Amino acid sequence: IRINRLRISDGDPVVIEETRFSQKYAFLFGENLEGSLYEILAHNGIIMSGGKRTINICNTTKEEAELLEVEENEVMLYMKDICVDANGTPIHSCKSIINPRRYEIIINTMPNKG
């Protein structure tokens, strides 16, 4: 199952998201996907417990540039997430193309206790 969304902030396109789920999550097609996918999953008893995030850069394709209202080949943030449940079973993967002029990433760190 693939869900494509264009995230808007203050009327401006900010993020193109492509989220992929296995067929096990076909019930999502009956849901309102304009809100939080995590809230929908939690409502259905599916809880994210962790995952992996990779952040890089990419250049926009013509289609991506049109959606984000930027020039083709413009540098964007590229983020890939893999989210898992408490057993480490993948729930979904998500690729995001993010306009860095309209988005901020904040990473909180914790001291190593080992």
Give the label of every model feature segment.
Residues 1-114:
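C-terminal all-alpha effector/ligand-binding and dimerization domain
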